[in-house]
From Swiss-Prot:
One of its GO terms (biological process) is tRNA methylation. Its EC number is 2.1.1.257. This is tRNA (pseudouridine(54)-N(1))-methyltransferase. It comes from Methanocaldococcus jannaschii (strain ATCC 43067 / DSM 2661 / JAL-1 / JCM 10045 / NBRC 100440) (Methanococcus jannaschii). It comes from the Archaea.
Length: 205
């Protein structure tokens, strides 16, 4: 299983999403949608061994965590607008819940769940599950030299994850891994990680 946690610092936490302005008024929702697309979609198939978490910190009601489960997704397609519609449905579901209900995962559509959960608490939950935390950072160890097992990959948006959360990841001894000496788009990082792991899987067969 491959898991990704994407911290979306400015992405809207209201269902009032303007599908014609995903980058602007929706707080770079376009970037989140591209990450979801690259996390799951192959040319004529979908990756069923992937779980993707987006932790949204935009206004008006942060934080909101949306979980996408590849083995359960239905009717989701790779384009940004389609994915944004499903995110809108998840946020609408969240708005319909009281604060007690928001403590648990609630399904909005098949394979998509929503919950009140912040970035650090999500990472701690993954640690409790026995996952290994890998922070994608250009100054980390070359991914080709790292043995990746039972992974959760941490990815920041165009802003990054912030100094406080970087210190938190250092405190829990998250492994920093680098995909390139250059700064890459978040969705490109996901594609590269998949490629690295796909090749290793083929070599092991």
């Amino acid at each position: 299983m491959r898991e990704f946690i994407f911290k979306a610092n400015k992405t809207i936490t209201s269902s009032d999403i303007n599908l014609k302005d995903l980058p602007g008024s929706c707080g770079r929702l376009d970037l989140l949608c591209r990450c979801v697309s690259d996390a799951f979609f192959l040319s004529h198939d979908i990756r069923r061994d992937v779980v993707f978490y987006a932790v949204l910190y935009g206004q008006p009601n942060p934080p909101v965590c949306i979980k996408f489960v590849g083995s359960e997704l239905k009717k989701v397609s790779p384009d940004e607008r389609n994915i944004a519609i499903f995110i809108k449905k998840a946020l609408k579901k969240f708005e319909e819940l009281d604060e007690e209900q928001r403590k648990d995962w609630n399904q909005s559509t098949p394979g998509i769940y929503v919950r009140r959960l912040g970035f650090r608490n999500l990472v701690l939950e993954k640690l409790e599950e026995g996952k290994n935390i890998y922070y994608l950072h250009m100054n980390g160890e070359d991914v080709e030299n790292v043995d990746i097992e039972n992974p959760v990959f941490i990815i920041g948006d165009h802003i990054g994850i912030g100094e406080e959360d970087e210190r938190f990841l250092d405190e829990i001894k998250a492994k920093r891994i680098s995909l390139s000496p250059l700064e890459l788009h978040a969705n490109h990082c996901i594609t590269i990680i998949h490629n690295v792991l796909d090749k290793k899987r083929i070599c092991e067969i």
